[in-house]
Design a protein with these regions (language model features):
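Initiator methionine at the very start of the polypeptide chain
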Residues: 1-2, 30
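Bacterial N-terminal signal peptides that target proteins for export
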Residues: 2-13
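Short intrinsically disordered, low-complexity segments
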Residues: 9, 21-22, 29, 53, ...
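Bacterial N-terminal signal peptides
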Residues: 13-24
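Low-complexity, Ser/Thr/Pro-rich intrinsically disordered linker/stalk segments at domain junctions
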Residues: 30-112
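Beta-sheet-rich non-transmembrane sensory/scaffold domains
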Residues: 96-1024
């Protein structure tokens, strides 16, 4: 084998030498020079190419790139200076073309040196190579893994980019936001593009004009499990941000890089969720050329079997690691050369001994690929081991022998830290740094100078572990974990054999965490400023409170030390920070904070800009929108109403604090805003208070605000009462039987005891109608969901808005009666859907309705229950004379929908019809709407007492929920919403990135538009 290898190499050397010395028999002769890429322009039909040929080129070769075979010759012609035309074979748009010119070097002169210099031997046999190269290679161009040239590494996407004093932020809660920080004391949002909940990866294309192009990478999903990635090019100019072009790419986004104007996307595609016979997947590495005001142009792609693609890159190389199908314990790594014409695959995929889990665990340098992986299992079971491997990967420009090395492509391997889990890796020159954790918690320094024999140069045992390493010359800055909190460290690695921990500082109390522990882009290290910034959040288990800050750290490269400095407080989890001039700008998804750091021990907050806020309800008042945040312990926000222009929900004009507690209902009537708040003594009042026995202070408060006299609502009056433990609103809105008497209905059912017997413990609450209940401990064997208290009606009197009153709670029935959530009120009457479980037949219930008479003053009158043929789903035409009750009976094979006439005391079945089992249904007026596969089925109740079919509404899907409100039918499925007039045939449809739309809070505006709250993602006004 050895003799064959030498023989082949000898023949190659002879061949190359012969090529070089052709025509050199005389003292002066023409000689071929180097090769150069020539300008090539394809025709529109891609069947011809025009190549611009400069003087000094002797031949032109046109090549095309094949994914499996690399660059292959198509045509070669003798060069003619000017423009040469080549005919091309038919090929798809994904095929790349290039033209190579062979340059005439001119004449070879032997006048430079004495003639005796040129009389020596000029042909040589193969000799043993040096350890770094491994086998001879002739380098045609200096592109061998970052060892030459001034190329910069491809850029990685982030949630924001800072360009001078302008910040571009892809906010998951809102979309693109552009902020001007020329005056840090007065930052301003200058442009925005609503695009929430679809991604956060952003690039800023190079440019210097006022108009800039931002690249936003977003994701979309089909109803059948498929996904795609969308490239959005956004033009930002003159206070506007608008999408100028888009391009969809198959698969979900996993990683990306931007090299100049070439976008490289790594996406994963799974087999069709519903029709797949196997769960195989593949990853797609696609290239796209980007330019302002142009559609992204496809520039090549590579398909790799496997998923979870992970990119590592350097100035002239890119590595892609995937999990091969069916394997999570190893990785397949493919290396590409980055060239002006795109990516060139340099070798077949290499399978690593373990799984590569991070982008800092791969490097290509000096024609060697180095990977660091973790192998978790061996013959004895779980036994994590870190494995470093070196593979031979030649640059495309290197001419090399057919047989590179007798040992194959794998040059060397190093196993270390058996029994330890791999936490951090980083390369710096010919050194690799590795951090593991479990038993001895070491930092390893690995010498890579001999790729065939990587060795541990030294190691240091330290407590805790590091999750990210940042080389700073012969220092190593690290962020990690120790003693249940985030820690920062600085190591001296000037002597690889003896690394030293110079300083470690704890960044918070136990329970502190940081996004930088899993995403190093959250950490900002500025060596030139001697500054590091890291976002921190701390949860206090005793108080239930969370705090968020950006911690400043001094990194003194001269003194080789690390020092803790001041903090910049955030109301919400900070995610990024940077230094703009003398100001630290830090950002969360809710707020941007600018702070002066002249004194790093005491940063001075200069300004705060609100970027996003939750919207749980939207109301329209006097040409404005009232955006209501419910508040509560989760998320850290308080109950607030914010005022915006009716057509610009993101432009907040004023805001009002609604006080403690959580908003449970809100309504706007006659220029007044009515807010129902629940004020709890514990965090989770609705469900756990009967168990904890700590809800004695729970109460409901009704607040009345004037919305006519000022831009911001002004509080007029308030009243409250104790609601009792376990109380929850049975109907999610205020009921108005009289203009001055709003009502709420309370239920006392436990919602979260799935499959458990209910346990009753002490309940010390004193209600308005009874003294303290006696202590009751033990197990109640009532069926699941049976309330322990009777449902109650609470009436308010708002005749005097400055002094509203609350009446005595009224029981709506005996304990054991449950409410189904349906309630309507009008003309002095309230109708509430009720049921009682049938103990003799599990799963069935007696359905009924409770009617309550309410006059403008005095006590309410509770009428007897009205038996209903099914569960109440809607009430229409309600007045003192009666109402129409629409009910349903669900079965395994079909659902029966019914209409009954009620006189206030009895229900008389009018007609019924069958619908698909478990189909969503609702009613409005005398029409019933049912979701089917074909759309929305419509039935109208005629004067003859029968249901009559109307044309089907085609909405394009089967809605999961339907609702009639204000004469409009609305329906939703996942992220899709539609609307149609109850008596109309025209359908308006929308799709959103936010999923599971809650129809109960969608309301019509005065002109018929829909006002939709999206919670954390804000609000939208949908034009109809």
């Amino acid at each position: 084998m050895k003799s064959n290898t030498l023989h082949l190499w000898h023949q190659l050397c002879l061949l190359l030498t012969a090529v070089v010395f052709i025509g050199t028999t005389g003292p002066l002769a023409a000689a071929s020079g180097g090769r150069k890429i020539l300008a090539l322009e394809l025709s529109a039909d891609r069947l011809t190419a025009n190549v611009t040929v400069p003087a000094g080129v002797e031949s032109v070769t046109v090549q095309r790139f094949q994914r499996d075979g690399g660059w292959q010759k198509v045509r070669t012609k003798t060069a003619v200076a000017g423009v040469m035309k080549f005919k091309l074979p038919a090929a798809g748009p994904e095929i790349r073309w290039r033209a190579i010119g062979q340059v005439v070097r001119g004449t070879v002169s032997h006048d430079k040196f004495p003639a005796t210099f040129y009389k020596g031997k000029s042909r040589f046999d193969a000799v043993k190579s040096g350890s770094r190269i491994g086998a001879p290679g002739i380098l045609l161009k200096d592109m061998t893994g970052g060892e030459g040239g001034n190329l910069s590494a491809p850029e990685e996407a982030d949630i924001w980019k800072v360009d001078g004093d302008t910040v571009y932020f892809f906010n998951q809660l809102r979309g693109l936001q552009v902020l001007d920080l020329a005056d840090p004391a007065d930052p301003r949002i200058t442009a925005s593009l609503r695009l929430p909940a679809v991604g956060q990866d952003l690039y800023l294309l190079p440019g210097s004009s006022k108009a800039r192009t931002v690249v936003l990478l977003t994701e979309g999903w089909s109803n059948h499990g498929g996904s795609w990635t969308r490239i959005n090019l956004v033009k930002v100019n003159a206070g506007k941000a608008e999408i100028t072009s888009t391009q969809d790419v198959p698969g979900s986004l996993a990683d990306s890089r931007l090299a100049g104007n070439r976008l490289i996307l790594a996406t994963t595609e799974w087999n069709d969720y519903y029709n797949a016979t196997d769960w195989s997947s593949r990853s797609r590495l696609s290239e796209w050329l980007l330019a302002a005001d142009s559609v992204p142009q496809a520039a090549g792609e590579t398909l790799v079997e496997g998923d979870g693609p992970l990119i590592a890159s350097g100035p002239d190389w890119l590595a892609l690691a995937v999990n091969p199908n069916g394997r999570w314990d190893v990785s397949d790594v493919t290396v590409f050369a980055i060239r002006p014409n795109g990516l060139i695959r340099m070798a077949r995929p290499f399978r690593t001994a373990g799984a590569v889990t991070g982008k800092f665990a791969m490097q290509w340098s000096g024609n060697v690929l180095t990977t660091i992986s973790e192998k978790n299992m061996d013959e004895s079971g779980w036994s994590p081991t870190t494995i470093l491997e070196n593979f031979r990967v030649w640059a495309p420009e290197v001419v090399r022998p057919a047989v590179i090395d007798p040992a194959g492509d794998r040059l060397g391997r190093l196993k270390l830290a058996k029994g330890e889990s791999l936490f951090a890796t980083r390369f710096a020159g010919d050194k690799a740094y590795v951090v593991t954790f479990l038993q001895t918690d070491p930092l390893f320094v690995i010498d890579l100078s001999d790729p065939k024999d990587p060795v541990v140069a030294g190691h240091l045992e330290v407590p805790g572990w590091s999750s990210h390493l940042e080389p700073l010359g012969d220092l190593l800055f690290a962020v990690g974990w120790e003693s249940e909190t985030v820690a920062a460290s600085i190591f001296d690695v000037s002597n690889p054999a003896s690394p030293k921990l110079l300083r470690r500082v704890s960044l918070g109390t136990p329970g502190t965490y940081s996004e930088a522990l899993w995403d190093e882009q959250a950490l900002k290290v500025l060596p030139h400023a001697g500054l590091a910034m890291i976002p921190l959040s701390t949860y206090d288990g005793k108080t239930g409170q969370s705090t968020s800050v950006v911690q400043l750290l001094d990194i003194d490269l001269t003194a080789r030390d690390l020092r803790l400095r001041g903090k910049i407080s955030h109301a919400f989890d900070a995610r990024r920070a940077d230094l703009i001039g003398e100001t630290v700008v830090s950002i969360s998804q809710r707020v941007l904070v600018a702070a002066g750091v002249a004194d790093r021990d005491a940063p001075a907050v200069l300004s705060e800009v609100t970027l996003a806020w939750p919207v749980d309800r939207v109301l329209e008042a006097n040409g404005h929108l009232l955006q209501i945040e419910d508040g509560g312990w989760y998320g850290g926000g308080g109950a607030t109403v914010r005022v915006s222009p009716a057509d610009a929900p993101e432009q907040i004009l004023a805001e009002t604090d609604l006080g403690e507690g959580t908003v449970r209902a809100a309504d706007l009537r006659d220029g007044k805003l009515f807010i129902l708040r629940e004020i709890a003594s514990t965090q989770s009042v609705l469900y756990w208070s009967p168990v904890t026995g700590k809800s004695g202070a729970n109460k409901l408060a009704l607040d009345i605000y004037d919305c006519q006299s000022a831009l911001a609502p002004v509080l007029l009056g308030s009243c409250s009462l104790k609601s009792g433990s376990g109380a929850q609103l049975a109907v999610d809105h205020l009921l108005w039987p009289q203009p001055n008497r709003p009502a709420v209905v309370l239920d006392y059912r436990m919602s979260y005891w799935y499959g458990w017997d209910k346990r009753q413990m002490t309940d010390p609450v004193v209600t308005l109608s009874a003294a303290a209940r006696p202590l009751k401990v033990g197990i109640d064997f009532q069926p699941y969901g049976v309330p322990e208290k009777a449902p109650r009606l609470i009436l308010f009197d708002t005749t005097l808005p400055n002094a509203p009153e609350v009446g005595e709670p009224v029981d709506l029935g005996a304990a054991g009666l449950s409410l189904n959530g349906v309630g309507e009120a009008a003309d002095g009457r309230i109708v509430i859907g009720t049921y009682r479980l049938n103990d003799a037949d599990f799963g069935k219930a007696f359905q009924s309705a409770r009617v309550v008479e309410v006059e403008s003053s005095g006590l309410p009158v509770i009428r007897p229950l009205i038996d209903l043929p099914g569960e109440l789903i809607a009430v229409s035409e309600l007045d003192r004379k009666g109402f129409l009750a629409f009910t349903q009976v669900s079965g395994d094979r079909s659902t029966t929908l019914q209409a009954s006439a009620c006189d206030g005391f009895e229900a008389f079945l009018i007609d019924s019809f069958h619908a698909p089992a478990y189909a969503a249904a609702t009613a409005g007026g005398r029409r019933v709407f049912v979701a089917t596969k074909a759309g929305v089925e419509r039935k109208i109740l005629g004067e003859d007492g029968s249901f009559h079919s109307e044309p089907m509404l085609d909405v394009g899907y089967t809605p999961d929920s339907l609702r009639c409100v204000g004469g409009i039918l609305i329906g939703a499925k996942w992220n899709a919403l539609f609307a149609a007039d109850v008596d109309g045939d025209s359908v308006k449809k929308w799709r959103f990135p936010a999923w599971n739309l809650g129809l109960e809070r969608v309301i019509p505006a005065s002109n018929g538009d829909l006002l939709v709250p999206f919670g954390d993602y804000g609000a939208e006004r949908l034009k109809r």
